[in-house]
Amino acid sequence: MKIEALSLAEMRTHRSEKWRGFPSDVLPLFVAEMDFPVAKPIQDILIEMVSHSDMGYLSSIPELGNAFAGFAKRRWNWDVIPEQVRLCTDVGVGMVEVLRVTTQPGDKVLINSPIYQNFYNWIKETKVELIDVPFKQEGLNWSLDFDAIEKVYAAGLKVHAICHPHNPLGRIFSREELTRIADLAKQYGVTVISDEIHAPLTFPGKEFLPFLAVSQHAAEVGICVTSASKAFNIAGLKSALIVSQSKEQHELLATMPISVHFRSSILGAFAAVEAFNKCDDWLDGALVTIESNAHYLKTLLDTQIPAAKYKIPECSYLAWVDVSALSLGDDPFQVFLDKGRVAFNAGKIYGPSANQFIRINLATSESVLAEAVNRMAKSL
């Protein structure tokens, strides 16, 4: 069943960053949160816990490992070991804490730009050296430069941090790509940290393969960081997962401070249990809406701004739009904001090669998307 977005009037009463980040005359389609109502099982557990004043300190929560393992098996046929699912505050904290146990200051960490902007912040926070091997771009298609990647691996790389599925490109790495990364990592002694927060948002008919499930090598070299937050629209509840498949990685993660677990939210942890156990139907409905919106945005752009180029993503609710042909200068985001009063994400925050792109949030209503494109057109 299709999930209907809340009205714009309702959304403007919300207190999150999306609705407080810009003046009220700006239409916001930037930060990755949805305009959809939270699934009822999640609402129910939160109401139950709050109404019973059940908001104390978080203890152990084996329910979460079991819930994620069940979800991973249903959605991706991944055999997760529940005891090797660890809790953390959010994916950003998870990435930082994993970097802290897999690197020393000055070690080299590889990313592939354009990439979610906080990868740069996480690497800076842990005082390691950023190495960037950008994607190769051919039109609207992006591919990994494996020759350059192997050279970096061979030169003494410690960690390769990947975003799978990819934000902002909206693509899912293939089995062949993931296998090659895993084989190279095994050969050169590199740890692969895979941010898989967008994985539950894979579109029907597309295949997501968890990195740790791709091969024995992947299980040995990989660590996954993920959360229910993106797919179930509960980012403010602060709960995420760090998952390992091998005994060695599990033992390494056990050296993290115990506080990594206890800094998480008890409400967020139990909301995630409900999300993974009881919200498949809601998620499927959200995906129907998001994929429909992805096609609707393409129709709007093709009709009103045909020079803007956009490829339907394979996952998630983030559209990656090439506006280079519109001649908007070095910062198209600012032109749309100043002239159209519509806020997207500026491509330049994802990497130096992406300044002529914008990222548009699709998890809204058709009417909001139509108004956004109308404001874009009026900016030209």
Predicted feature residues:
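Conserved core segment of the aminotransferase class I/II
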Residues: 45, 216, 220-291, 299, ...
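Active-site phosphate-binding strand-loop segment of PLP-dependent enzymes
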Residues: 136-206
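Conserved glycine-rich beta-strand-loop-beta hairpin in the small C-terminal domain of fold type I
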Residues: 273, 290-298, 310-323
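Helix C-cap/helix->beta junction micro-motif
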Residues: 126, 187-188, 218, 340
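PLP-dependent enzyme catalytic core of the Aspartate aminotransferase-like
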Residues: 150, 331, 335-344, 350-380
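PLP-dependent aminotransferase-like
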Residues: 100-162
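N-terminal small-domain helix-loop-helix segment of the aminotransferase-like
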Residues: 2-90, 97, 276-278
